[in-house]
Amino acid sequence: MILEDLLMVLSCLALHILWKVQAVPILPLSLVPDTFDDAYVGCSEEMEEKAGLLLKEEMARHALLRESWEAAQEAWAHGRHKLTLPPGFKAQHGVAVMVYTNSSNTLYWELNQAVRTGGRSRELYMRHFPFKALHFYLTRALQLLRGTGGCSREAGEVVFRGVSSLHFEPKRLGDSVRLGQFASSSVDERVARRFGNATFFNLRTCFGAPIQALSVFPEEREVLIPPHEVFLVTGFSQDGAQSIVTLWSYNQTCSHFNCAYLGGEKRRGCVSSRAGQPESFSTEALALQSGKTLLLAPGELQLSRAGP
């Protein structure tokens, strides 16, 4: 009788664990082609001229954006004098970072939802993407804070990212993937684990920018990774209900969009931008160590998964 009871308890425990694992959605890691991934290569100055008015129009239509921006603007005015910032870094760039890092509201989540699906077409972006100015200012902030050259200029940053509600899994080792959104990470593994363990990422990023000095929560020691950075999947394992993923940056970005607000259409392939040349596109195929590349046109690449 005791043995039967014990087996019953173990059976129930196993079912409970299985239910918990299955209750967390599983999403494949990929190049997320529907991401709005504009890096504004060659048009950042023109976008700076237009983004101010665009921001006012978008704030008029989105109350949370207006409230968040105004609060961050006030905080920026009080703290700006304490910061050492790179040339070209404007107040709007700093305010955009503060808006994003303020997790006391849902704006960062709404922005990333829009980013992950807003790149299906330029028409969809123009008509329905509600954060065009915020996306531009945040993208430029990361570019200016990180500087040009990626890992060609300085060593990549080893960071950690915890996700609480989703299991991300690669199809296989050697895949080329992007995170497909603005992805928060930390140089402190303990901090990252506080944000979740359904998926835990170990990353080496070449284009993620340290934003601790600008963050609403500086103790998180955050590094913010842009949607368009390309990574190699170098490791994957599962420990109970946890997926553990290791990603290594290619020191490369790729985008389907460039200067979309100014008329740039979505391109068939993901166009790579070589580190160190942020205002021009590479005309060569990416030297992917474990994947395949299909050359489409000068500067255009279709990154495909590794394997036969």
UniProtKB/Swiss-Prot annotation:
Residues 1-23 form the signal peptide. It comes from Rattus norvegicus. Its EC number is 2.4.2.31. The gene is Art5. The active site is at R161, S184, E222. Glycans are attached at N102, N197, N251. Disulfide bonds join C43-C259. Keywords: Disulfide bond, Glycoprotein, Glycosyltransferase, Membrane, NAD, NADP, Nucleotidyltransferase, Secreted, Signal, Transferase. InterPro entries: ADP-ribosyltransferase_ARG, ART. NAD(+) binds at Y100, R161, Q181, S215. One of its GO terms (molecular function) is NAD+ poly-ADP-ribosyltransferase activity. Coiled coil: none annotated. Pfam families: ART (PF01129). This is Ecto-ADP-ribosyltransferase 5. GO terms for cellular component: extracellular region; membrane. Its main location: secreted. Residues 63-253 form the TR mART core domain. The lineage of its organism: Eukaryota, Metazoa, Chordata, Craniata, Vertebrata. Belongs to the Arg-specific ADP-ribosyltransferase family. It is found in: Secreted; Membrane. It catalyses: L-arginyl-[protein] + NAD(+) = N(omega)-(ADP-D-ribosyl)-L-arginyl-[protein] + nicotinamide + H(+).
